[in-house]
Each structure stands twice: as structure tokens, then as C-alpha cells.
């Protein structure tokens, strides 16, 4: 059978036209596309972007937080409609978009950021962008007048995807558009990790950017052409791009070739580092009409590594060549070369090129069943906690409030082991979703308004050890299967309508059987009531007497306020002291009208002053805009006027006059430890021995608060900026505004609102609101890591942003040089250093019960110091005081006293 050439060409034309029409239909369909106009009003209908035809919808329903804004009019003419509005996030540290996706699917994810001075502050923000629990990129808007686009190709592992904006400084994260485009799963595959956009060029001198609807996947192609080295080829013929990657026909309709027929086509780019891994995708199509004797064949190499020995592009059909494994370039400089083979009559050509760098996302997402269960519980109770966004368990610094998780390693999905929703204003019955937390060990639903019966399914959670349902309104009988569950501690008191056999509503420690308590418990309860009532009456009369006396001591300034300060003080007791009080005029005089500023903190400005023209002091004035207030002021005055220790900063006096509040301390000439570590104060770098002496003295001050005072005190804000140094570099602990007493007599903690500094904050305290002295131990562990490494506590540019996680990673390599401050130049005893590192990591144990006490810390640090002293190191202008100082528990009163 013979085929007429014209018939063949006609069939080919029909096929190509049909294929083009099919792609046009797909483009118009936008199937699977998610296009969010961030900051649109909730009731705003979807609209088509005039420049692309893409349909954008409001982001309402995809994010639970944030505020809306709009770029200034001066910038509106530069950007398309979807970029004019934005959503910014002034509250919380992590704010997340949650998107429903198809599991195990490659998605092109794009986030667009245009600052446009929307807030009128001319202060472009910088923040981190996370994909699920993993860092994607740091977005820095400084100098980006035209905005920035972040793009990644990522394979989903579940039916839900979180894109999170994380605050890293004082500025608020913001976003204009968020876009997802599903890709074919046989394209852009990697051995591991995701593909971060590096560049995407088509080789043409057209000057036109190309995206949707020309590109059915909405990739954006930028033109690139070197007129000095290349010749441009173009065609008006249709090109078949059915190879899966589907670069747009308009992209493939142009190409570049070397000007010289005998030349080599080359293209180079520079990667961030020599260790950066990348994937390269080369798109070819022969678009020149070849004569009968013409041949185009060339060799493809990348940095001398052969990719294709003899390649000839297909006529009017797209082919994509790529490496199946990630590549690296020496010194980060990459060179792609297309070299003409001896048999070729035509030079090589290149139509389009894509390069992506590899981002490894090592942290696995929380077990999807646990996530579904938690979200079901959240929906049942209508919980809207700002921390309940993104992955519930990871990264650890963003663990959801009230949760505890078991995160053994990055290769295992974290599981939820503890759920604490106490005092969360819950109503209704116990949520069914709780039964799906199959690894739960502790459940605390106390102090809510839950009703109904106690469900039997709680007994089916085999791992449960503690259930606290006290302080609710449950009724009915307790399931027998729950009463008989061995090893379970069941707390039920405070449920008046609950039928409790044998008095078990007082407490039930599961031991396989119920004990008879119907006689003993009423007697004990009656005696306890009498004791409590008597104590309460005695305390009332003592407190009333003290309050009257102390109010007189404080003077009329406590009752003459007409500002906000008075409102704050109306519920506070007066400062219980008869020690030195300065007038505001005296403060003005001692500071020479606030002439010399020493620093600034959360309380307010700190000024240099002198008392009696002889004693230097530091005067801390409460700013009217301060986040701290009279409560913290009062706490610090009362504590410092009652405790005296050589490693606690001394309080000379205070001022409490009208709206003017001031704390007057002894002057610490060498500022704080952080300034010395960072080099801000100049001078020589603190050597290892001096650093050890400073932390020994700081530990002694903290240990005194824990063990030398009655009741014991928790500092709650231990950090390097609160460790002050005098002229001899002796250390004293400062800033006691957040300090709290904690229980003794067998109690282990006090429940309190979380306070402290991010990075130093005990995660167990943050999670449970249970404060004890081990919270200070955790913070002190962070301080130890700072003096060891001289690293920032949180640094998003590190592989592990938090210093504890980073040191943990370095320790796995076993090389102390990776951890130690390089400015020490190895001048230290390695045994001393290792003991200090081990001590720091023990202080940072996730379980407070497994952390050492401050007494143990003092002993261990002195051991570290003895190792270093034995080496023969020299201290820096610091008197030798390395004796071990450990406080004893003397019961000397109800308030802290001098030891």
C-alpha cells in the first residue's frame, strides 16, 4: 500500500491541531489548581485575573489567623490584581495555611510576596517559610521593591498540606498569593527531597515572560539570549510537547545556536556552595527545516561529565534530557556544554533549560491518624488556640499548646502521648476523637464544664496511665472496665453528679480493684475542712494587718494615681518593705536628668546614676508603654529587698511616685554576659576559664533562690542578658520581675501563666503551665550552650535553628571542634569542655524530673573549672573564687530571707 506524502502531512497536521486543542481545554479547566488571593474578604467572590485568566479565590477558610492589608497606591500600577492585597500576621510565632491536596502527588507550589509599604513603616519584613514541619526558605523583603516569588516542587505524603509563615524578628510575616498546581507524577522525580526553583529559561530574544495559559502547569519561563555568542532560531510550525513535562509550544518555538558553525554552545551558573545538589532539565526540539544532507548531532556534558554522547533533537517534537540522580559542581560553578560531533553539519541548539536545587525535608509529619484525631477534637470543642496551627508535634519549638509528643527521630512519624485541655472552657461530652489517639499516656480534661457520662472507650486506649476528669459535671456511673484497668490513675473529684462507688471520686489509683473508703474519707474530709478553714481565717487576719501597715509605709503615692497605672494597682497589694525609697526628684538628680543611657529592656530604659555623689547605680525606669507593669515592679522590689547574696544583683532602693516607677540597682560596670560573648563591648574575648567562673557564680545565685529561700523562688527568665558582670567580671543574676515562689511540702509545681524568653523557655513548662525550679535549670542549660558555642540561641540559617538541637546534631559527629566557639582557638581543656557539654544537655532533658538540680549543677561546674585550672589557664581580671557553694534548706519564714 502506498501513502501519498500530502495525505501524511495532512494527518500530521490534524493530529497536532487536535493535541493543541486538547491542551487548550486542559488549560481552561484549571483542574486541581488552588489559587488564593491572600487578604481578600471572606465574602468576596472568585474572579479571573485579567493578565492570566486564572481564577483566584479568597483565602478565608484556609487560614485561621492574620489581618488583611493592601499595598500602597504608588505600587499598584506595577503589579497584577492578585498581588494588590495581602494578609499579615502580627500575632503568634507560626501561622499556617492548610490545603486539601491529593496524596502522593507532585505539586508546583508558589508563594508571592509584595510588601508595597502596606503598613506605612518602610520596614520590609524578614521571616521563615515552612512546608509542613520543615524549613523551606527564609523570605527577606529588604531591597525587593518588585516583590519576590518562592517556588518549589514537592510530593505530598498526605491529603493535607500546611504552608506556614514563621516570625523570626520584630516584623510581621505577610503573603499576597499562594498557588498550587498538580503535576504529572512521572515528571520532576527525585531520589530524595524536594525541588526548589533556581532558574527556568527559554532561549529567545523575545523579552516576554511566559506562563499560564501557554503553560498548562503555570510555570513561569523567562527569556535569555546572548546576542554576542548565539544565533536565534524560530519557527511558526506546531510543536508536539506530549512528553509529560509539556513545556509550552511558544517556549519550544525558539532556540539558540552558536554563531560559529564549529562552535560549542555553553551555559554556566553559580550555585550557593560546592555541596549544593541540583537537578537539571534540558528541553530540545528541532525547529529548523533541515536539508537532505543536513545533520544536527552533539554531545551533552555537565562539568565534563557525559550526559549524552550523540544526541539529535526530534523534528518538531519535544524531548527532555535530565540526570536521574542529583548533581554537584566543584566550587559551585556549573558549566553545561553542547559540543558538535564530527558527523554533524549543524551546530548544537538549546530550546529551554530548568535547574532546581534539592531541599531535604528530614522531619516527618506527625502520625496522620493522630493529626486527624486532634483536629476532630478541635472541631468538637471549637478550640481556636493560636498555637494550634501547622503540624501538632513538630518542629518542637512549635509544639501545640497542651500536647506532648514522642518524637524518637526524624525517620519516624511523631505520635501524641499527652493531651492537656484543662481549664479550656470545654462543654458537652468527652469528644469521640480522643479514642483515636491510640498512643495517649496522659489525658487531662480537668476544670471544664463537661457533662454526660464517662465513656468506656477510654479503657480501650491501652497506653493510658493518667486520666484527670476532676472539676467537671459528669453524671452516671463510672464504667467498670475503667475501674478495673490496671496501672491507671483516675482523678474524678469535683463531679457532684457522678455516682462513685466506695468514695472513688476522691481519688482512684488503678490497682485492679476498689478499696473500701466510705468511712475513712468522710472523716478525713471533715478534719481537712476544719484545718483549711482555720488556716484561711488566720491568714486573712495576718494579711489584713500587714496590708494596713505596709500601705502606710508606701505613702500616699499608691492612692493618687489617675492613669492606667492606678487601674493596674487596684488589685495589687502594697509593696511590703520599709527600706529606702527615693522620690522622683531624687531620681532625676541622681541620673543628672537621665543623661547617660546604659541600655533598654522590656521594663524600660536603664540610666547611669550616682547616690550621694559616691555610689554608682543603675536606674531602671518603667516605661508607660512597657509590657511589664506594677506587678513585676512590686515582685522585683520585694524579692531584692529580702534576699542578699553575692551572686544576685543588689537593690539600692526604688521610686514609686505617681506614674514614675524606678528600680535602683548597684552598678555593674561590665554590662551583661551576652554583650561580651557577641563582642559588642569590645576588648578581649572571654577565655574558657573566665566563662566557667561566670557560669559557676551565676549558678550559685540561682541555686540560692531555689534552696536558700523559703518559700523557694523560680527566676523564670534566666538568660545571658540577665547575667551582669562587675568591674572584676564577677557575675550576678538580675531581673527578677517574673520570679515566682513554688510549693514545698511534697508538691512539685505551681500552675501559672507561661512567662519567659523564647529559646530559653522550658518546653515542658510551656506545654503544661506547671512551673518548678527545673524550668530554671532548662534555661541555664541554654546559657551553658551559649558560653560553649558563642552561637545565637535561635538562628534560622543553621541546619537546626535552636541551639539545643544544633548541638545535639553536632554531638552525633563526635567532634568538639564543631561545637566550641572558634574564637577560643582551642585554648581549653577538652575534658572540661566535654563535662560542660554533657551537663548542658542533661539540663535540657525534655523531662524536668530527669534534669539535675542547681546544687548538682554547681558541683559539676566546679569540677569543670578544676579540670581547666589544672591545665594552667589564666583568668581575665577575675579574682579566684571557685569554692563550691551549696545552700541548705533552713525554714526561716514565709518570705525569702538572707542566708
Curated annotation (Swiss-Prot):
What CDD domains would the database entry show?
A: STKc_IRAK
Q: Which UniProt keywords apply?
A: ATP-binding, Cell membrane, Glycoprotein, Kinase, Leucine-rich repeat, Membrane, Nucleotide-binding, Phosphoprotein, Receptor, Repeat, Serine/threonine-protein kinase, Signal, Transferase, Transmembrane, Transmembrane helix, Tyrosine-protein kinase
| Keyword Plastid assigned | no
Show the InterPro entries listed in the entry.
Kinase-like_dom_sf, Leu-rich_rpt, LRR_dom_sf, Malectin-like_Carb-bd_dom, Prot_kinase_dom, Protein_kinase_ATP_BS, Ser-Thr/Tyr_kinase_cat_dom, Ser/Thr_kinase_AS
User: What cellular component terms from Gene Ontology apply here?
Assistant: plasma membrane
Q: Which residues bind ATP?
A: 598-606, 620
Phosphothreonine PTM positions read 583, 752, 757
Q: Where, per the database record, does this protein carry Phosphotyrosine?
A: 665, 765
Q: Where is the signal peptide?
A: 1-27
Question: Care to name a GO molecular-function term for this sequence?
Answer: protein serine kinase activity
The chemistry this enzyme catalyses reads: L-seryl-[protein] + ATP = O-phospho-L-seryl-[protein] + ADP + H(+); L-threonyl-[protein] + ATP = O-phospho-L-threonyl-[protein] + ADP + H(+); L-tyrosyl-[protein] + ATP = O-phospho-L-tyrosyl-[protein] + ADP + H(+)
Q: Which SUPFAM superfamilies does the record match to this protein?
A: L domain-like, Protein kinase-like (PK-like)
Provide the membrane-side ranges marked Cytoplasmic in the record: 544-899
Protein kinase domain mapped to chain residues:
592-865
What family does this chain come from, according to its entry? Belongs to the protein kinase superfamily. Ser/Thr protein kinase family.
The protein's name in its UniProt record: Receptor-like protein kinase At3g21340
Q: Which organism is it from?
A: Arabidopsis thaliana (Mouse-ear cress)
Amino acid at each position: 500500500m502506498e501513502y501519498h506524502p500530502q495525505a501524511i502531512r495532512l494527518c500530521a497536521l490534524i493530529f497536532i491541531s487536535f493535541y493543541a486543542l486538547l491542551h487548550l481545554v486542559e488549560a481552561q479547566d484549571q483542574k486541581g489548581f488552588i489559587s488564593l488571593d491572600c487578604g481578600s474578604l471572606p465574602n468576596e467572590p472568585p474572579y479571573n485575573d485579567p493578565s492570566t485568566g486564572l481564577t483566584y479565590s479568597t483565602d478565608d477558610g484556609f487560614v485561621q489567623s492574620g489581618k488583611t492589608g493592601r499595598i500602597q497606591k504608588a505600587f499598584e500600577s506595577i503589579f497584577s490584581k492578585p498581588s494588590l492585597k495581602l494578609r499579615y500576621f502580627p500575632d503568634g510565632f507560626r501561622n499556617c495555611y492548610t490545603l486539601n491536596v491529593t496524596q502522593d502527588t507532585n505539586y508546583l507550589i508558589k508563594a508571592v510576596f509584595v510588601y508595597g509599604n502596606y503598613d506605612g513603616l518602610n520596614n520590609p519584613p524578614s521571616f521563615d517559610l515552612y512546608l509542613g514541619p520543615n524549613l523551606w526558605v527564609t523570605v527577606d523583603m529588604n531591597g525587593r521593591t518588585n516583590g519576590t516569588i518562592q517556588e518549589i516542587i514537592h510530593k505530598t505524603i498526605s491529603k493535607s498540606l500546611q504552608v506556614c509563615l514563621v516570625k523570626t524578628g520584630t516584623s510581621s510575616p505577610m503573603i499576597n498569593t499562594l498557588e498550587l498546581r498538580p503535576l504529572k507524577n512521572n515528571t520532576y522525580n527525585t531520589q530524595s527531597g524536594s525541588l526548589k526553583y533556581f532558574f527556568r529559561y527559554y532561549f529567545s530574544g523575545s523579552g516576554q515572560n511566559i506562563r499560564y495559559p501557554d503553560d498548562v502547569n503555570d510555570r513561569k519561563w523567562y527569556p535569555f539570549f546572548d546576542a554576542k555568542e548565539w544565533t536565534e532560531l524560530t519557527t511558526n510550525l506546531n510543536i508536539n510537547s506530549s512528553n509529560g513535562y509539556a513545556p509550552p509550544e511558544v517556549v519550544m518555538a525558539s532556540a539558540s545556536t552558536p554563531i560559529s558553525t564549529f562552535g560549542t554552545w555553553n551555559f554556566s551558573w553559580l550555585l550557593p556552595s560546592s555541596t549544593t545538589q541540583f537537578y537539571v532539565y534540558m528541553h530540545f526540539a528541532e525547529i529548523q527545516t533541515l536539508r537532505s544532507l543536513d545533520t544536527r548531532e552533539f554531545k551533552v556534558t555537565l562539568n565534563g561529565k557525559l550526559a549524552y554522547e550523540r544526541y539529535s533533537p526530534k523534528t518538531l517534537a519535544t524531548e527532555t534530557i535530565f540526570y536521574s540522580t542529583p548533581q554537584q559542581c566543584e566550587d559551585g560553578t556549573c558549566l553545561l556544554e553542547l559540543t558538535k560531533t564530527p558527523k554533524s553539519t549543524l551546530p548544537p541548539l538549546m530550546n529551554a533549560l530548568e535547574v532546581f536545587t534539592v531541599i531535604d525535608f528530614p522531619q516527618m509529619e506527625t502520625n496522620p491518624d493522630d493529626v486527624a484525631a486532634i483536629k476532630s477534637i478541635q472541631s468538637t470543642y471549637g478550640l481556636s488556640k493560636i498555637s494550634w496551627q501547622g503540624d501538632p508535634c513538630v518542629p518542637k519549638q512549635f509544639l501545640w499548646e497542651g500536647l506532648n509528643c514522642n518524637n524518637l527521630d526524624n525517620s519516624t512519624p511523631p505520635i501524641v502521648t499527652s493531651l492537656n485541655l484543662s481549664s479550656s472552657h470545654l462543654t458537652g461530652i468527652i469528644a469521640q476523637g480522643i479514642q483515636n489517639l491510640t498512643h495517649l499516656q496522659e489525658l487531662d480534661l480537668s476544670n471544664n464544664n463537661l457533662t454526660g457520662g464517662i465513656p468506656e472507650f477510654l479503657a480501650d486506649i491501652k497506653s493510658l496511665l493518667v486520666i484527670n476528669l476532676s472539676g467537671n459535671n459528669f453524671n452516671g456511673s463510672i464504667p467498670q472496665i475503667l475501674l478495673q484497668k490496671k496501672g491507671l490513675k483516675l482523678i474524678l473529684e469535683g463531679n457532684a453528679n457522678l455516682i462513685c462507688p466506695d468514695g472513688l471520686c476522691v481519688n482512684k489509683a488503678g490497682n485492679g480493684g476498689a478499696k473500701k473508703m466510705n468511712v475513712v474519707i468522710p472523716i478525713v474530709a471533715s478534719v481537712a475542712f476544719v484545718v483549711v478553714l482555720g488556716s484561711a481565717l488566720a491568714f486573712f487576719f495576718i494579711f489584713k494587718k500587714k496590708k494596713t501597715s505596709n500601705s502606710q509605709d508606701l505613702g500616699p503615692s499608691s492612692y493618687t494615681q489617675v492613669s492606667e497605672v492606678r487601674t493596674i494597682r487596684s488589685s495589687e497589694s502594697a509593696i511590703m518593705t520599709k527600706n529606702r525609697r527615693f522620690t522622683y526628684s531624687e531620681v532625676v538628680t541622681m541620673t543628672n536628668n537621665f543623661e547617660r543611657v546604659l541600655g533598654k529592656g522590656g521594663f524600660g530604659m536603664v540610666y547611669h546614676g550616682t547616690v550621694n555623689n559616691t555610689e554608682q547605680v543603675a536606674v531602671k525606669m518603667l516605661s508607660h508603654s512597657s509590657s511589664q507593669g506594677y506587678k513585676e515592679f512590686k515582685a522585683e522590689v520585694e524579692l531584692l529587698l529580702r534576699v542578699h547574696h553575692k551572686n544576685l544583683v543588689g537593690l539600692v532602693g526604688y521610686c514609686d511616685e505617681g506614674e514614675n516607677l524606678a528600680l535602683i540597682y548597684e552598678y555593674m560596670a561590665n554590662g551583661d554576659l551576652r554583650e561580651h560573648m557577641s563582642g559588642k563591648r569590645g576588648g578581649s574575648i572571654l577565655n574558657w576559664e573566665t566563662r566557667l567562673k561566670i557560669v559557676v557564680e551565676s549558678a550559685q545565685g540561682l541555686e540560692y533562690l531555689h534552696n536558700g529561700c523559703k518559700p523557694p523562688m523560680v527566676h523564670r527568665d534566666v538568660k545571658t542578658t540577665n547575667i551582669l558582670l562587675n568591674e572584676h567580671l564577677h557575675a550576678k543574676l538580675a531581673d527578677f520581675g517574673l520570679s515566682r515562689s513554688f510549693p514545698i511540702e511534697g508538691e512539685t509545681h505551681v500552675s501559672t501563666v507561661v512567662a519567659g524568653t523564647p529559646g530559653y523557655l522550658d518546653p515542658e513548662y510551656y506545654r503544661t503551665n506547671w512551673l518548678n525550679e527545673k524550668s530554671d535549670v532548662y534555661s541555664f542549660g541554654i546559657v551553658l550552650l551559649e558560653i560553649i558555642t558563642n552561637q545565637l540561641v535561635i538562628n534560622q540559617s543553621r541546619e537546626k535553628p535552636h541551639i539545643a538541637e544544633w548541638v545535639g546534631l553536632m554531638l552525633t559527629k563526635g567532634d568538639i571542634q564543631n561545637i566550641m566557639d572558634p574564637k577560643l582557638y582551642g585554648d581549653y581543656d577538652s575534658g572540661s569542655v566535654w563535662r560542660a557539654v554533657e551537663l548542658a544537655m542533661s539540663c535540657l532533658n525534655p523531662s524536668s524530673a530527669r534534669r539535675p538540680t542547681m546544687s548538682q549543677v554547681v558541683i559539676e561546674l566546679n569540677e569543670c573549672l578544676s579540670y581547666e585550672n589544672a591545665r594552667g589557664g589564666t583568668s581575665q581580671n577575675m579574682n579566684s573564687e571557685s569554692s563550691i557553694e551549696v545552700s541548705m534548706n533552713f525554714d526561716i519564714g514565709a518570705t525569702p530571707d538572707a542566708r
